[in-house]
UniProtKB/Swiss-Prot annotation:
Organism in which the protein naturally occurs: Mycolicibacterium paratuberculosis (strain ATCC BAA-968 / K-10) (Mycobacterium paratuberculosis)
Family designation: Belongs to the cyanase family.
NCBIfam families attached to this UniProt entry: cynS, PRK02866.1
InterPro entries: Cyanase, Cyanate_lyase_C, Cyanate_lyase_C_sf, CYNS_N, Lambda_DNA-bd_dom_sf
Protein name: Cyanate hydratase
GO biological process: cyanate metabolic process
Function summary: Catalyzes the reaction of cyanate with bicarbonate to produce ammonia and carbon dioxide.
Enzyme class, UniProt record, top EC level: lyase
Lineage: Bacteria, Bacillati, Actinomycetota, Actinomycetes, Mycobacteriales
Domain of life from the UniProt record: Bacteria
Length: 155
């Protein structure tokens, strides 16, 4: 059955196995020597996991070996529903980009020129920062600047 499993079904198995075994996302990331958020995102179906690393994770999670090629296959990225997210944590990122997205775009254009921040040549990090009024969540997006290049196909 697992060989015919979809990536979404495998993701559900990963979440259940991780909880059942009492593993943290950090422990899984450490097992393969990859960053925490990359590993978590990959295990949630957003990045392909090289087979040699997939084998380590499958073993650690107690999953069938036939999960390895499913993990290694290029995923359908951005698989979140297109509606406004309802999960409170994810919604706060949506809300923050509604409030600050325009300003971020303007300042990127002012400091870098006309272009975008890559989400392909990209990393993300999360840190916990102690604060007297309550711990802070510090999220860092680190993406390569990609200038728009308007080129005619006839050139």
């Amino acid at each position: 059955m697992l060989g015919r499993m979809t990536r979404n079904q495998l993701t559900e198995q990963i979440v259940v196995a991780r909880l059942a075994k009492g593993l943290t996302w950090q422990e899984l990331a450490d097992a393969i020597g990859r960053p925490l958020l990359w590993t978590t995102s990959a295990l949630l179906g957003q990045h392909p996991i090289p087979a040699e690393l997939g084998r380590i994770l499958v073993d650690k999670l107690g999953l069938d070996e036939s999960a390895v090629p499913v993990l290694a296959a290029p995923p359908m990225r951005g698989g979140l529903p297109t509606a406004v997210p309802t999960d409170p944590t994810i919604y706060r990122f949506y809300e923050a980009l509604q409030v600050y997205g325009g300003a971020l775009k303007e300042v990127i254009a002012e400091q870098f020129g006309d272009g975008i921040m890559s989400a392909i040549n990209f990393s993300v990090d999360l840190q916990k920062k102690p604060h007297p009024s309550g711990d802070r969540v510090v999220v860092t997006f680190d993406g390569k600047f990609l200038p728009y290049q308007w080129v005619s196909s006839e050139q």
